């Protein structure tokens, strides 16, 4: 029987099983199936997926993320904050500002430390990708997808689509408590107009610096939080004139709050907590 040590961590309730690949060895061919198994709340550990903290040739660490359905994702805002916390607290980095490699590129992390423990992490998520081909999405001739008509099962909606290294589509709602997360979410996630699938966000605008947010994540379903989704929601809200550029926006997620800023320089900055839940050994 094989085994590996793990740390379970969460960012605003978005939990993953973190594996230190500097110390552990898991066959590449088993990563997808193991992500499914460890995520299972009944027969595994229970999580939204599995994240590997790996050696990198271009940064102190590299993050690989596997969703609970076994698919490999390119980016994860909540995961990045937890990787930053783990890397700093385990001595993988000494500076409080450092880079993390992801499948969608390098991102910069800055940790806030109190008594040797990381309490908050700010991630520079880079520039949003706004071209239809970058999301990607099939549809109208317009280069950007902003307040675009979108029909699902005979009903008309308006959507805005943004990539933060992974694809997001935003629906605005009047009341976040009645948002059709579990009904519309899974349909849109696999809509053929999004050839790589899509994360589906529902946003209620409170004012010009505050949003309520719920998400149906590609490959995971309903989660307590989605960092890249919160970033995409703020970018979409600026594009639609609902919030302001270069101004902090508080995004209220099911698991807590993130502070997001789309700077005048073009990058999106995300600040929020990261917490360790437990450590253990998984047998397979």
UniProtKB/Swiss-Prot annotation:
Subcellular location per the Swiss-Prot or TrEMBL entry: Cytoplasm
UniProt site (Could be important to modulate the pK values of the two catalytic cysteine residues): 168, 217
GO MF: diaminopimelate epimerase activity
Protein origin, superkingdom: Bacteria
Pathway(s) it belongs to: Amino-acid biosynthesis; L-lysine biosynthesis via DAP pathway; DL-2,6-diaminopimelate from LL-2,6-diaminopimelate: step 1/1
Keyword annotations of the record: Amino-acid biosynthesis, Cytoplasm, Isomerase, Lysine biosynthesis
Residues that hold substrate according to the record: 14, 67, 77-78, 166, 199, 217-218, 227-228
BP terms from Gene Ontology: lysine biosynthetic process via diaminopimelate
SUPFAM superfamilies xrefs: Diaminopimelate epimerase-like
EC number(s) reported in the record: 5.1.1.7
InterPro entries from the UniProt entry: DAP_epimerase_AS (IPR018510), DAP_epimerase_DapF (IPR001653)
Keyword Amino-acid biosynthesis: yes
Catalysed reactions, semicolon-separated: (2S,6S)-2,6-diaminopimelate = meso-2,6-diaminopimelate
Catalytic residues of the enzyme: 76 (proton donor), 226 (proton acceptor)
A Gene Ontology term for the protein's cellular component: cytosol
NCBIfam families named among the record's database cross-references: DapF
Family, per entry: Belongs to the diaminopimelate epimerase family.
Main function: Catalyzes the stereoinversion of LL-2,6-diaminopimelate (L,L-DAP) to meso-diaminopimelate (meso-DAP), a precursor of L-lysine and an essential component of the bacterial peptidoglycan.
Subunit structure: Homodimer.
Protein name: Diaminopimelate epimerase
Protein species of origin: Geobacillus sp. (strain WCH70)
């Amino acid at each position: 029987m094989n085994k590996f040590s793990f740390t379970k961590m969460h960012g605003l309730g978005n939990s993953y099983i973190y594996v230190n690949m500097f110390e552990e060895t898991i066959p590449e061919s088993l990563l997808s199936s193991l992500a499914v198994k460890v995520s299972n709340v009944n027969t595994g550990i229970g999580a939204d997926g599995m994240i590997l903290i790996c050696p990198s040739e271009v940064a102190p660490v590299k993050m690989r993320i596997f969703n609970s359905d076994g698919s490999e994702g390119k980016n994860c805002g909540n995961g990045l904050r937890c990787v930053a916390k783990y890397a700093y607290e385990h001595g993988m980095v000494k500076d409080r500002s450092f880079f993390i490699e992801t499948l969608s590129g390098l991102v910069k992390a800055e940790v806030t430390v109190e008594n040797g423990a990381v309490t908050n992490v700010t991630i520079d998520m880079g520039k949003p990708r706004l071209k239809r081909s970058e999301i990607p999405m099939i549809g109208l001739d317009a280069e950007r997808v902003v307040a675009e008509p979108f029909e699902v099962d005979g009903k008309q909606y308006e959507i805005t689509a943004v990539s933060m290294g992974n694809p997001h589509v935003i629906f605005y709602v009047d009341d976040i408590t009645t948002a059709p997360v579990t009904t519309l979410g899974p349909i849109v996630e696999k809509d053929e107009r999004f050839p790589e699938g899509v994360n589906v966000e529902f946003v209620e605008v409170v004012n010009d610096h505050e949003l309520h947010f719920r998400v149906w994540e590609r490959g995971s379903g309903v989660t307590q939080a989605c960092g890249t989704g919160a970033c995409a929601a703020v970018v979409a809200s600026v594009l639609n004139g609902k919030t302001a550029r270069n101004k902090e926006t508080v995004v209220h997620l099911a698991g807590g709050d993130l502070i997001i800023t789309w700077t005048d320089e073009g990058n999106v900055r995300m600040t929020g907590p990261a917490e360790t839940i437990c450590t253990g050994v998984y047998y397979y």
